[in-house]
A protein has these predicted regions:
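Short amphipathic alpha-helix used as the core "switch/output" element in two-component signaling
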Residues: 62-73
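Residue-level signal for the "D+5" position in two-component response regulator receiver
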Residues: 31, 56-59
Protein backbone atom coordinates (compact mmCIF):
# COMPACT_ATOMS: atom_id res chain seq x y z
CA UNK A 1 0.00 0.00 0.00
CA UNK A 2 1.36 3.40 -0.99
CA UNK A 3 1.93 5.97 1.71
CA UNK A 4 -0.06 9.19 1.53
CA UNK A 5 1.40 12.64 1.99
CA UNK A 6 -0.63 15.78 2.59
CA UNK A 7 1.03 19.13 1.94
CA UNK A 8 -0.66 22.21 3.40
CA UNK A 9 1.18 25.23 2.01
CA UNK A 10 0.11 28.30 0.05
CA UNK A 11 3.26 28.43 -2.10
CA UNK A 12 2.17 26.83 -5.37
CA UNK A 13 5.72 26.32 -6.67
CA UNK A 14 6.80 24.61 -3.45
CA UNK A 15 3.78 22.30 -3.56
CA UNK A 16 4.39 21.45 -7.22
CA UNK A 17 8.03 20.55 -6.58
CA UNK A 18 7.22 18.49 -3.49
CA UNK A 19 4.35 16.71 -5.21
CA UNK A 20 6.57 15.79 -8.16
CA UNK A 21 9.36 14.59 -5.88
CA UNK A 22 7.11 12.26 -3.90
CA UNK A 23 5.02 11.01 -6.82
CA UNK A 24 8.24 9.80 -8.48
CA UNK A 25 8.86 7.80 -5.31
CA UNK A 26 5.42 6.13 -5.35
CA UNK A 27 3.68 8.25 -2.73
CA UNK A 28 0.11 9.45 -3.11
CA UNK A 29 0.25 13.22 -2.68
CA UNK A 30 -2.56 15.59 -1.77
CA UNK A 31 -2.19 19.37 -1.64
CA UNK A 32 -4.17 22.08 0.13
CA UNK A 33 -3.34 25.77 -0.10
CA UNK A 34 -5.00 26.83 3.17
CA UNK A 35 -5.86 25.43 6.60
CA UNK A 36 -9.57 24.97 5.93
CA UNK A 37 -9.04 22.80 2.84
CA UNK A 38 -6.15 21.01 4.56
CA UNK A 39 -8.24 19.99 7.57
CA UNK A 40 -10.91 18.58 5.23
CA UNK A 41 -8.30 16.53 3.33
CA UNK A 42 -6.69 15.43 6.59
CA UNK A 43 -10.03 14.06 7.81
CA UNK A 44 -10.96 12.44 4.48
CA UNK A 45 -7.63 11.01 3.32
CA UNK A 46 -6.00 9.94 6.59
CA UNK A 47 -2.42 10.59 5.35
CA UNK A 48 0.72 9.02 6.79
CA UNK A 49 2.79 12.21 6.56
CA UNK A 50 1.79 15.87 6.82
CA UNK A 51 3.87 18.83 5.66
CA UNK A 52 2.34 21.87 7.37
CA UNK A 53 3.38 25.46 6.70
CA UNK A 54 2.85 28.07 9.37
CA UNK A 55 2.07 31.23 7.42
CA UNK A 56 -1.12 30.45 5.54
CA UNK A 57 -3.80 32.79 4.15
CA UNK A 58 -6.37 31.74 6.74
CA UNK A 59 -4.14 31.55 9.82
CA UNK A 60 -1.14 29.99 11.44
CA UNK A 61 -0.92 26.33 10.56
CA UNK A 62 1.08 25.37 13.61
CA UNK A 63 -1.77 26.40 15.92
CA UNK A 64 -3.69 23.39 14.57
CA UNK A 65 -1.02 20.87 15.58
CA UNK A 66 -2.58 19.93 18.96
CA UNK A 67 -5.93 19.24 17.26
CA UNK A 68 -4.22 17.21 14.52
CA UNK A 69 -2.20 15.16 17.02
CA UNK A 70 -5.31 14.48 19.09
CA UNK A 71 -7.15 13.13 16.03
CA UNK A 72 -4.18 11.33 14.44
CA UNK A 73 -1.53 10.58 17.08
CA UNK A 74 0.53 8.35 14.73
CA UNK A 75 0.74 10.98 11.98
CA UNK A 76 4.27 12.11 11.10
CA UNK A 77 4.13 15.92 11.01
CA UNK A 78 6.80 18.06 9.38
CA UNK A 79 6.30 21.71 10.27
CA UNK A 80 7.79 24.03 7.68
CA UNK A 81 8.36 27.76 7.49
CA UNK A 82 10.74 30.26 5.97
CA UNK A 83 10.10 32.71 8.80
CA UNK A 84 10.49 30.70 11.98
CA UNK A 85 13.25 28.71 13.57
CA UNK A 86 13.16 25.32 15.26
CA UNK A 87 13.17 26.98 18.68
CA UNK A 88 9.86 28.69 17.85
CA UNK A 89 8.01 25.37 18.05
CA UNK A 90 9.18 23.11 20.84
CA UNK A 91 7.72 19.64 21.28
CA UNK A 92 8.64 16.33 22.85
CA UNK A 93 6.50 14.42 20.35
CA UNK A 94 8.88 12.32 18.26
CA UNK A 95 6.42 12.33 15.33
CA UNK A 96 6.82 16.10 14.91
CA UNK A 97 9.85 17.77 13.36
CA UNK A 98 10.51 21.34 12.27
CA UNK A 99 12.18 22.16 8.96
CA UNK A 100 13.15 25.59 7.73
CA UNK A 101 12.56 26.58 4.12
CA UNK A 102 14.10 26.23 1.71
CA UNK A 103 14.16 22.48 2.20
CA UNK A 104 17.25 20.84 0.78
CA UNK A 105 17.05 17.84 -1.51
CA UNK A 106 19.63 16.15 0.72
CA UNK A 107 17.29 16.43 3.71
CA UNK A 108 14.41 14.96 1.69
CA UNK A 109 16.58 12.11 0.40
CA UNK A 110 17.93 11.31 3.86
CA UNK A 111 14.52 11.44 5.54
CA UNK A 112 12.57 9.54 2.87
CA UNK A 113 14.95 6.76 1.80
Amino acid sequence: MRKKILIIDDEVDFCTIMKGYFKKRNYDVLVAYNIKAGIVLLDEANPDILFLDNNLPDGEGWKFVPRIVEKSPQLKIILISAHLHKADFVTTNENIVVWEKPISMELLKETFK
